[in-house]
Every structure is written in structure tokens, then in C-alpha cells.
Amino acid sequence: MAIASNVVEAGNAVRAEKGRKYFYFRKMIGDYIDTSIRIVATVFLADLLLRLYRCVVEYGSNGRYYLPEDRLWIILRRSCTYNNRSIYLIVGFLLVAFFRISVTGNYRNVMPTTLFLFQMPLYWIWSFTDMDQSTLSYSHWIRDSHGLDYAAGMASNYFHGYLKLSLPERKDDGLKHRLAMYEDKNNVTFGIKRLVILIPDEMFVNGVLESHLLDKAEPLETQFINRAGVYRPFKHDVYRMNKKVNGRTYYFAVEGATPMISFFDATYSNLSGTWQMQELKREIWIKFYKHLKELITTWPETRDLVELIIYNSHDSKGNLVDVGELLVAHMQNKTKTIDEISN
């Protein structure tokens, strides 16, 4: 009997010890969750106060950037707008906080104490010093789809101010019509029945394309289009391939992307160049191509009129890529894609 009693007592002791460990484990997890909620609540409150402070500074110092009748509303809306990820985070922690209150019955466990609130200046110091910002942050900002970056702006201006005006058919003056008229008049054939736009990674294209395979020919018929009260000429150069492909001589309407040339000039100019432009020029090059391609393919009037060719200006051996060979390769569907070039 004594032995049996000892066994029972030992079993009870083991169960009691396991119960204590389980209790302390649950308490540790609960305390961790409560502390996390307090930290998030403190950060949110500090961020809200910082946003309100910035509203006051913006209203007092930069009011000229807003119309008087809606200045306050726009400043508040811009300052107090949260992105989707922040909203999801706040809602998630609110749900966890309500769950903890329902379990413990004590809302004080998830409310920030005075000790937590006194830590808010640390968040303000962190924000004012922009400790989370780096050059990589600029890269991610350029890649986002907001239309405010340099690359998207150049692509949009190029598309709306040039391609969308000069290429679609209006009164028998569109690109397709002019290509057909050129072929009939000169008894030639275009290798690519679109306007070919070159986008090299150097962002520079000579005024006359240099290639031992290309000879400059007569340009397409010039268009004159009224733009802001001025009849502006729109021209497209034509080049003849002096090497026969499949027994035929082909012509190409081809030109460089002029916004990229302007960006090249701006980057290397002492007046406008910055180290950020130098550092992120490849990001801008790729974003320009992607955004321009999206605009061209989305707009019904231009999706079949432009052929973008993005390429590295030098091959793996450091030799300059020949534009004529590039056109032949593209015509034969061997041009590298943007993903291959990026890698």
C-alpha cells in the first residue's frame, strides 16, 4: 500500500509540475502578446502625433502649394492617409487586442502605460533622421506604379506627346498608310511593318544610326499636326538593309528613344546631373521600357504600330552591338527579352 501511495503521489507531483509549466508558458505568451500590442499602440499614437505636427508645419510654411478653399482638407488627407499594409496591420492588432480583452476581461493589459508613452520621442527621432531610407528605397519607389518617377514621366510624355499623335490613322496619314505608300512608291519591303524604337542601356543613340549593314534612305512622309496652336512636323527616318535576308532587301523605319537621350544628357550635365541619377540609371532605363510598352499595348490605336527593342549596348566581350545585326535578329525572333537582359 505504501508503495502504491508513493507512486500515486509521484504521478500527482509530475502532473502538478506539468500544469505549472503549462500555466507559466501560457502566461508568457499572453504577456508577450500584450506587450506587443502596447508597443504597436504606442508607435501608432506617436506616428499620429507626428502626422498632425507635419500638418501644422505644412499649413503654416507651404500653404502656397494649395488652393485656399480646400487647403486644410487636402493637407489633412495627404498627411493622414495610410497605405493598405499599414491598415491591415492596425486592423490585425485591433482584433488581437479585442481577443485578449475578451479572454482576460481586463483592457488595461493592452493599453500603453506611462513608461511606453515616454518612449515616443525615440520614434520621432527615428523618423526625422530617415534611418529606414537607403538608395534601395529609391529603387523600390521607381519600380512602383504611381507615375511620379522620372522614368514613368518620360515614357508618358513620349507616348502622349509623340507616338499617340503621329502613328494612328486619321486622314490617310497614319503609320500603316505611310509605310504602304512608301513600299508602293519605291517598290521595297519593310522588314518590320512598325516603327522600331531602340532603347539601349547606354541610353544614347547617334543622330544617324551607325551600322555596316544599314544605309540611310528617304524618310517617310512628314506629318504636320496641330499641337497647342503650332503645326509641328513629325518625321520618321528609314534605313535600308544592304545585306539581303532570305534573298530580299528590307527597309526599316527606326529611331532611338529620344527621352532616353535627353536623360543621358541630363545625367552627365553639371547643371542637372545628380549622383542618384547616375546610381539608378539602369532602374530608370528598365522602368521607361516597361511603362512605355504598357502604354503602347494598352492603347488600341498604337498596340500594333510600335516595336520596342531594348538591348545592352555592348556584348559579353565589350564590343559595341551592331544595330543592323540587332534588327536582323529581331526580324528572325532572336532578340533577347527584357528579363534576360535584366539578369
UniProtKB/Swiss-Prot annotation:
GO cellular component: autophagosome; endoplasmic reticulum membrane
Keyword entries, A-Z: Antiviral defense, Endoplasmic reticulum, Glycoprotein, Immunity, Innate immunity, Membrane, Nucleotide-binding, Transmembrane, Transmembrane helix
Pfam families: STING_LBD, STING_TM
Membrane topology: Multi-pass membrane protein
TM annotation in the entry: 87-107, 109-129, 195-215
Molecular-function GO term, any one: cyclic-di-GMP binding
Glycosylation site positions: 84, 187, 270, 333
Locations listed in the record: Endoplasmic reticulum membrane
Main location: endoplasmic reticulum
Induction details: Expression is directly activated by Rel (Relish).
GO biological process, one term: autophagosome assembly
Binding of 3',2'-cGAMP, residues: 157, 232, 235, 255, 258, 262
InterPro entries hit by this protein: STING (IPR029158), STING_C (IPR033952), STING_C_sf (IPR038623), STING_LBD (IPR055432), STING_TM (IPR055434)
Record bears the keyword Nucleus: no
Described function: Facilitator of innate immune signaling that binds cyclic dinucleotides produced in response to infection by bacteria and/or viruses, and promotes the activation of the NF-kappa-B transcription factor Rel (Relish). Recognizes and binds cyclic di-GMP (c-di-GMP), a cyclic dinucleotide messenger produced by bacteria such as L.monocytogenes, leading to activation of the peptidoglycan recognition protein (IMD) signaling pathway and activation of Rel (Relish).
UniProt family annotation: Belongs to the STING family.
Protein name (database record): Stimulator of interferon genes protein homolog
Species the sequence originates in: Drosophila melanogaster
